């Protein structure tokens, strides 16, 4: 876990703003339009320093496409109390036993996956399993969460072991509504709780 934590901690705001790093990408293994292989090739062609393919609830893309430059990642659907959220896991051991119960049973992580509506994933158990698998746990696009108090919401997750928060995210592009928090307020919360700041385009298209 420490290697990936230090690597991602070293990524700067400038890296994200210049498009040199993209830690939130989806392929056809979930609801993206591009193949896993095409995304890897595009990332290389664009000269990305680091990139992660983070399909919903599945690592099948990483299993079937080993030995690429992509950081292993997943975007999990999970509940915390009354709040439905997405947790990004980075740098996980693909063979870790504790993680297996959290993956979708469907090969494509979003296809006919009832868990996306009535998720049985528990945020505390998931974060613990991510750490057991050598990974780091990051709250995705927090401004989309129905949290009346974002500070308390994040504090709860930090007490469970949350490592980071997705600060750099194209809300106008992908999310029609920002719920109760602004992107600027999220960065302040990240600083308050000493969280790793990550970011990505949440790409679902054929082109990065």
Question: What would you call each of these model-derived segments?
Answer:
Residues 24-26, 56-57, 141, 202-204:
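Histidine-centered divalent metal-coordination motifs
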Residues 2-15, 59-163:
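Extended substrate/RNA-proximal surfaces in nucleic-acid metabolism proteins
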